[in-house]
Amino acid sequence: METGLRWLLLVAVLKGVQCQSVKESEGGLFKPMDTLTLTCTVSGFSLSSYGVNWVRQAPGKGLEWIGYIGTGTYLANWAKSRSTITSNTNENTVTLKMTSLTGADTATYFCGSGANIENEFFNAIWGPGTLVTVSS
């Protein structure tokens, strides 16, 4: 009986984990000065309760924070002049828009959400990432 309850609990926990997911839309190949639009779709929790972070990782480099949307919208200093982050809580999506792309924007872009309020960045559920290449 005890073993059966343990299995039931394990299945319930795993099912709960599987129900929460975050995924970025497809990236692709862009030309310099193009505009990038990426959408982060979350399921299993509501964006009215949790914020979303965007980060990116250029080839051979570390993670670079782009911005966050939750109770407010915050952007890295380098991104402020050409980036916007908007949220659609009805569709549970967050959109990152970045204009005037250059080769330096070539990176894998990630969004993360679903974390607890106290530590949203580190405890977030992150998407698999999407590769964006900027080249003429």
Swiss-Prot record:
Signal peptide start and end residues: 1-19
Pyrrolidone carboxylic acid PTM positions: 20
InterPro entries per record: Ig-like_dom (IPR007110), Ig-like_dom_sf (IPR036179), Ig-like_fold (IPR013783), Ig_sub (IPR003599), Ig_V-set (IPR013106), IgHV (IPR050199)
CC terms in the record's Gene Ontology section: extracellular region; immunoglobulin complex
UniProt KW Endoplasmic reticulum keyword: no
UniProt keyword Signal present: yes
Superkingdom, taxonomy of origin: Eukaryota
Gene Ontology BP terms: adaptive immune response
Ig-like domain boundaries: 20-127
Keywords per UniProt: Adaptive immunity, Immunity, Immunoglobulin, Pyrrolidone carboxylic acid, Signal
One Pfam family matching this protein: V-set
Name of the molecule in the record: Ig heavy chain V-A2 region P-MU-3
Organism encoding this protein: Oryctolagus cuniculus (Rabbit)
